[in-house]
Amino acid sequence: MSSIFGENIVSDSIVNMELTNPDNTTTMHPIYETNIEKEVQQEFSDNVSEKETIDSTKSKISLENIQQEMGALAKKIFHKLGVKATDLGFSNEHDDSQDSLQTLAPSPSYVPLLKVIGSSEEVNSNLVLTDLETNTDGYDPKFLISVRKFLMGSPNSGFVVKHEKRLPDGPRVLALRAISSVDEENRKERLSPDSDPVETESVYVDNGELSNQKVETVEISEKEQNDDPAGYSQYLLEFKKSKCQKKVPTLESIEENEGTEPHDNLTFMTDLGTPYYSLGNEFERKQILDEYGLLANDENLVIGHTLRAEYCFMFDESDILQLRNYEHTEKELSVLQFKGVSSRWDFRCCREERLLRLLLCFDSEHTGQSFIQLNDPENENEKEEQNSISIRELSYFSTKLISLILPKEAHKQRYIMLSSLAKTREADFFWSEEEKTNYTNELLSNPCKFLCELDHFDSFPHQQQDLLWKYLAEFSASLELDPNLALWKKQVIFSKIGHPKLLVMPISSFHCVQRFPDLVCVQTSTAETFLSVDRELTTYDLNTIKLLNTAPSRTAQNWLFIMHHLEIVGYLFPHLVHLDKQYSLLDYAKSVEHIPELGTVQRKGFLNKVAFDDNEALLYQV
C-alpha cells in the first residue's frame, strides 16, 4: 500500500516486486535501452537539422520556448519508458553515498489509495476502494455508493470491509444460470410442473483447500414466480429471516439444510459464511451496510463477506500455542474456551489478554443478525444451535484480517487542519543556527519532549519539521544494536517513509513468524500483535523498492512494510504507540532524572528479544 502521508505513488499499475532482484530500481529495463537511445538520438538529430534551416531572423528562441521543447522531448522519453516523470523523483536524490543520508525527501501530501487484498488470481474479486476517482467499471454502482456512504463516509468508521466484486447473486439469477447451462430440451423439461429438481454442485473452502460440497438442490417454480411476483418477494424475505436464525457454517464444517421444510419451493446455493440478501433488495443491502458500519465503530475491524482460500485458518490448534510460547492466564484461558452467544472481536491486545479481547455486543434474541457464528469443529454432527470458538479461529481473526488500516475521516480532517496551520506559521517562522542548535540539544536531553513534538509534527513549520526528521534519524538509529541496521534505518527516515511517531519503534520489536512468511509479530513491553503483510500486491514508489531490496535482514523488510502500510498507526493503534507520556514501548523512564539509565534498560530489553530474530535463517527456506 502506498504511503498515506505521501511518497510518490505508482498509481496506474501494480508493481510486482521481486525482493531478490535489487536491479529493478537501479538499471533501465534492457528492452528499452537500445530503442530509447536510438529514439533520443533521432529526436536530437531532427532538432539540429530543423534549426540549421531556420532563417537568421527567427533564430532567437526564448528560454521559455527551449524549456517547452525539452519538456516535450522528456515526456516522449518517459512515455516510451512506460513510466511517469514523477515516478523518477527519487532516482537522483538517493544513492548509496554517505551524502544521501543528509538529503531529506520532499514534503509529502495526503493521497487516497487503492489497496488490493488476495492472491494474484483474485485481483479482480477482492478490491478495497479508498479512492473516489478509482475506475469502478464493472462494479455494482449502487453497492459502491452504499459502501462509501455507510462505511467510508461515516465519521465513526475507521476500517474498510473486504467485499466481493459484486453482491452475491440472488436465487433467481442462480436459477437462470442453472437453466441456461443445459440444452433447450432439458430446459423445457425442468420448467414443466412434473419435472425433477435441478441438481448442481457448488464448492466451499475447507481449511484453505477447495473441495466438493454435497449437492444442494435448486428447485424452480417459474410459474409461481411470474404469476405472483409480490408474493414471491415476500416469500424470499420470510425465507431469509428463517435462515438467519440458524447458525452459519464455518470453513471447518458444513451444516446440512435438514431443517428445510418439504413445502419450500426454493432452496438456493449460498457461499458459506456469506450473509444472504437477494439481488436488488436495497433494504437488505442498507441494513447489512448499516450493521457493518456499527461494527466498525470504536476502531474495531470488520469481517468481510466471504473468506476465500487465502484467508482460511493458518494455524493448527497447537501452532498458536507454540508460536510464541504463551503461558496463558486464567482469564486468557477462559477466552480461549469461551462458549456462548455470538460475539465480535476487538483486535487491540493488552497486557492481560495478549491474543485478543472478546466483546459481547449481541443479545441472545438477535443472534441471527451476527455475520460470523462459529461452530465447534469437534461437534460437526451436533444439531443443537450452540456456538463455540476454537484456538484456530482465534488465531485467524487476530492475524490475517489485520491487513488494511485506513484513517478515519476525523484523522484526515485533522491532518488537513494541521497542515494548514503549518503553512500559516511558515511565513513568520525563522530560526538562526544558534536557535536550531539549542532546539536539537533540548530534544537530546529530553526524549519525552521529543515524542510529544512528534504528536504535533504536522502543525510545525517546514524548518522545524526538517530538524525533527534529522534528529529522528539519529535517535531512531541509536536504538539499533546492528550498525548496518542503523545506517539503513537512517536512509528510510530521510526518505520520509512512514509517520515520524511510528518510526521511533526499534526494528528489534518486529519479528518473523516461523513457517508463516506473511506474518509479522510486533512486540512491545505491554502488547504483542500479529500483522499480515501483503508483499506482492502492493504499490510502491521506486525509492521504497530500493530500500526494500537493500534491507540488511528480513526483519528489517518487515519493519519497512509495516511503516509503509500503517503510517497513521499512532492514531489508530494505541497498543503499538502508546499515548501516555511514559511511552513504554521504548522503555522510557517516567522522569528526566532516570534518562541516563535509558540505554541500559533498552539494551536489556533488546537482548531478551534476540532469540526471536534467530529464527530468521529458517524463514529464508520457507
UniProtKB/Swiss-Prot annotation:
GO cellular component: cytosol
GO biological process: meiotic cell cycle
Keywords: Meiosis
UniProt-recorded name of the protein: Meiotic expression up-regulated protein 25
Species the sequence originates in: Schizosaccharomyces pombe (strain 972 / ATCC 24843) (Fission yeast)
